[in-house]
């Protein structure tokens, strides 16, 4: 999954991060209200968001070039 993220442009990474955050919030809401089919999905989403945050930070500090 990480290789797939690293091939994206900065704008695509930010868009993907936003969509994953929305999906994570929806999943959290479903967990509070009722039953979640795959409870491990929350962990996977949280880790993917962290990976994307790391890549964005690499762009910001200059480790990764645009």
Swiss-Prot record:
A biological process term (GO) from this entry: translation
MF annotations from Gene Ontology: structural constituent of ribosome
Gene Ontology annotations for the cellular component aspect, listed alphabetically: ribonucleoprotein complex; ribosome
Pfam families on file: Ribosomal_L29
Coiled coil (residue ranges): none
Keyword line: Ribonucleoprotein, Ribosomal protein
Xref: InterPro entries: Ribosomal_uL29 (IPR001854), Ribosomal_uL29_sf (IPR036049)
Record-stated family: Belongs to the universal ribosomal protein uL29 family.
Protein name from the UniProt record: Large ribosomal subunit protein uL29
Native species: Borrelia turicatae (strain 91E135)
């Amino acid at each position: 999954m990480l290789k797939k993220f690293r091939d994206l442009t900065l704008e695509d990474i930010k868009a993907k991060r936003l969509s994953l955050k929305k999906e994570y919030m929806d999943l959290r809401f479903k967990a509070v209200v009722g039953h979640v089919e795959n409870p491990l999905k929350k962990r996977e989403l949280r880790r993917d968001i962290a990976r994307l945050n790391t890549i964005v930070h690499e762009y910001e500090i200059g480790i990764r070039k645009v």
